[in-house]
């Protein structure tokens, strides 16, 4: 193995801790440090957003489904987003749906479970690479046009929005992130980008980066090998993608 590039959120903590041993074996990687990885965790996202000057819906970690019995009296009205600390996000319109989501997420991802205020608006995602010093390289942006039942992008179109780019740059600078990154935001009715999630890897739609003239996996490989990354063209907005699955 020359280079090891993780693709799943749950792989990151293990591989970050193993990075020195991997380097000793001659296996290259391009990974954040433990502090950077922890700083973008879903249960610390609100703190990061405040530090970077980015809006974000309030998020609360919980360990008991009993929270949903009287959450509306605690100023947490439905609908709410119920999320796993590593993965999974489900919209709950009432107590019953919230408790079902809570139990399913605990069974797969463990505790805590996160409850997030639901923001409505236009969903956009940005993928790029942090260089470890605070710079964001090769950003590619897309707007969701169709989603799965879990809210994952099934179809989308490439965009270029300077305000979204600046928002992502502030977040990457605050983290001093190193490696691939996906930033999920919601553009609310006031035109403000609300930070929803930061994922520590490329998204499933990353092939769109090749389609818009910015091959981010190739850039990541070059950086991991210590080579100069390829020159990037300005991204091409208006490129449509549709995901498909074959079993």
List each language-model region with its residue ranges.
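Short amphipathic alpha-helix with an adjacent loop that forms part of the alpha/beta core around
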Residues: 1, 68-75
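Short, charged, surface-exposed secondary-structure boundary motifs
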Residues: 31, 37-43, 91-94, 149-151
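Structured catalytic cores of enzymes that bind and process phosphorylated ligands/cofactors
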Residues: 29, 45, 57-61, 112
């Amino acid at each position: 193995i020359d280079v090891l590039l993780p693709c799943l959120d749950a792989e990151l903590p293990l591989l970050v801790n193993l990075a020195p041993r991997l380097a000793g074996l001659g296996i290259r990687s391009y990974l954040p440090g433990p502090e950077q990885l922890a700083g973008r965790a879903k249960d610390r996202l609100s703190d990061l957003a405040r530090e970077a000057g980015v809006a974000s819906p309030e998020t609360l970690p919980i360990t008991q489904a009993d929270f949903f019995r009287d959450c509306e009296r605690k100023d947490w009205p439905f609908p709410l987003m119920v999320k796993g600390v590593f993965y999974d996000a489900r919209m709950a319109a009432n107590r019953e749906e919230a408790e079902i989501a809570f139990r399913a997420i605990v069974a797969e991802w463990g505790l805590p479970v996160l409850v997030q205020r639901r923001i409505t608006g236009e969903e956009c995602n940005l993928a790029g690479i942090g260089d470890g010093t605070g710079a964001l390289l090769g950003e590619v942006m897309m707007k969701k046009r169709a989603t799965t039942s879990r809210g994952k992008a099934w179809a989308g179109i490439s965009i270029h929005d300077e305000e979204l780019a600046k928002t992502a740059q502030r977040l990457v600078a605050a983290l001093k992130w190193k490696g691939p990154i996906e930033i999920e935001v919601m553009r609310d009715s006031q035109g403000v980008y609300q930070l929803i999630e930061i994922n520590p890897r490329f998204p499933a739609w990353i092939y769109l980066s090749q389609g818009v003239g910015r091959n981010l996996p190739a850039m990541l490989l070059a950086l991991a090998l210590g080579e100069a990354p390829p020159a990037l063209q300005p991204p091409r907005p208006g490129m449509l993608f549709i995901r498909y699955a074959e079993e």
